């Protein structure tokens, strides 16, 4: 029941955010068709709770391995799930930025959730596609493996994504358990 409480809280927050953005985009021409992706996480009693909408991602970094915890709500991920294309093809697909879910696009939103065990030393990465679209999981893992402060790791992730042609804005959060 505790798990459900945390997930209910997170999905409720997503629904509230969705309503706010949706109402704003419908009441003010300046914000017409406004929408966003979102990923949120909370840690309680050695469990990581993740809620997300769109293609912003959550990863768990443990023992030099990056583990994606989310699955993009995107057109190309639908093709991957159907077996029409591979994950490698999806990364280069012309429609790779077309998302199938977002906050603020409709009056309701479907939020996906994940619960994953965490342990001391794990690093949780939440990021937009400005980062995950430019760096491979292995490249991010290499940076997170460095024996430097967490804020330095974050700065290097952004620098490297920009160096590789980052054309999108980049938001990220790193949390060490």
Protein language model regions, located:
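PP2C/PPM-type serine/threonine phosphatase catalytic domain
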Residues: 1-177
